[in-house]
């Protein structure tokens, strides 16, 4: 299966695997086994983040996989993200150094700004009084230095609207390679897709299954009658159908699971396709953003007074 895996080319010339393992909400104690299983199944992209609180465990597993000869470092694409408490420019390099130490790596393939939001250094919660003013171009300049140092092969952003991404492109010396955002059949992001395509920025989709298993977001994407009907027609599961939709839309996908059977099922999305007449039916699915970022909005204490401002109307 590993030989079949597809890639998308980044504006750096590097290739990002089309299917990656998401590790958000993968609990310590189980995330390591999930990463090991995924790599052995054939996954070549592991999506991490400082905020997920599990990079130390992932690092131990990666080292063992390398030491045991299961996979070579250069065959894996490792993404991580800088958390919002480290976005003051002088803190950016230290944040990546901590992630590299935790992951036991010399470099990451991709380093993302997790949100266009800054929180007070040292805080752990999302209280409004912890939200700080953010200077995205200055933080980005510090991110660019990570590329210069070789510790990040590519840099990008996450949860950026079309407008915020456009503003960053205007200011950047090193253009963002990726915008990682929520993307699934119930939140298709057509406007952002078109903008990213026009600027050579790769869109990567987190929660491509709508975050099943979470309690704090409405996550019934896979119960869409459209998806259920198409899945039945083509003889695939609803999850595989939703994931394949993402690939055919032209973006990489980051399904998260700690169940080996589902990790395997989620990887079996290559070598077949959804016929055009069925693919067109996805346009009938009702749209709703699941991950809204309400914690980052406050009428007096945040730069973003409303969700409309946070997402620049893409809500």
From Swiss-Prot:
Binding sites annotated in the UniProt record for NADP(+): 23-24, 47, 114, 158-159, 180, 207-213, 256-258, 262-266
GO molecular-function terms, A-Z: oxidoreductase activity
Modification N-acetylalanine occurs at: 2
S-S bridge residues: none
Residue numbers bearing the Phosphoserine modification: 295
InterPro entries found in the cross-reference section: AKR, AKR4C, Aldo/ket_reductase_CS, NADP_OxRdtase_dom, NADP_OxRdtase_dom_sf
SUPFAM superfamilies: NAD(P)-linked oxidoreductase (SSF51430)
UniProt-recorded name of the protein: Aldo-keto reductase family 4 member C11
Native species: Arabidopsis thaliana (Mouse-ear cress)
